[in-house]
Amino acid sequence: MANPKIPQEFWSSYIVEKLRRTNPHIMLCFDESKYIKGGSVVYIPQAGTQPSVVKNRGFGAATAVQRGDTAVMYGLDVFTTDPTAITNAEANEISYEKTDSVLGDHTGTLAETIGDELTYSWVKGVKPAVGGGTTVEFLPSGRQIPTAGTATAVNAEDGQTGTRKAFTYKEVQLMQAKFNKDNVARDNRYAMVESYMYQQFIDSLSANQMAAFQATADLVNGVVGKFAGFTFLERSSVLALTTAGVFRLPGEALEATDNLASIFWQKDSVTKALGDTKLFQDMDNPLYYGDIHSGLVKMGGRCRRQDWKGVGLVVQAS
């Protein structure tokens, strides 16, 4: 029986707010939550070939063609926390409200994990395969820009060794040009930059560039500045790839030669869908002599375009 002090409505609003505050990028994408099919899948139609335009068409009927639309899809992942028991003795004897603390741990862990997974889902695509089933693909190398700064020692915290070329403002300008060339909408462009790559970017700016960048910061909403049309966010971990270009899973330990990456996107080019959010509570459990709590959130996402336009990476280069 659910604890009346913690109704499901409160949990749902609490976890959504925690997701928003911990992961600003969750709100900076297209929301397809209302299009979830069967509680776990979202299909995104992909328009077929555009019609040709003929100047001064000659006499006679034009040939009618049918546009062959396709679809891409993504499933919602189910994120759950390990159950936590609060014994009756703890509830009666400790000097702080442990239930609130435990729920804070659950929401914080869920938010951090989901934030990492959503970024990964934007570079991973699933689409229906001919004859049934699905195929999986990843952001192609043509949408990845290597860093081009001076050789800089990596940080040992991520498990890397050696040096990588530093991330500079010039790579951001190249990404801006790529988006412009692809006719990607010029508003609502964002960049999520790994912490050390962000520091390298800052170091590459001139005094005037730095002043302009800092003047556009909105730290309350997680924005550290704007440059070349991109609104910058900073995060301790974003993405990582092997030297062969294979994406590391979120939370996976890195090899010494792996490379970190920062992601760039336009808001309408990537998506998320939030499904069920539920707090499980087993009050006065006779086996644990107390209350047991755990949480569940269903969420998924991907790049909305099969051609991957509107998404790009800046990847460390040796």
Predicted regions and their residues:
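N-terminal "assembly arms/tails" that initiate or stabilize quaternary assembly
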Residues: 1-73, 309-310, 314-316
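C-terminal appended segment following the main domain
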Residues: 260-318
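Glycine/small-residue-rich hydrophobic helix-like segments
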Residues: 221-283
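Short, catalytically relevant binding-site loops at active-site mouths
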Residues: 196-200, 238-241, 305
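Short helix/loop capping segments that flank catalytic or ligand/cofactor-binding pockets
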Residues: 52-55, 94, 200-203, 303-304
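Extended, solvent-exposed, turn-rich assembly/linker loops in the middle of proteins
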Residues: 131-220
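Long, contiguous amphipathic alpha-helices that act as assembly "spine/axial" helices in icosahedral shell
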Residues: 44, 69-139, 180-195, 278-303
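Short, cationic low-complexity segments
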Residues: 213-227, 314-318
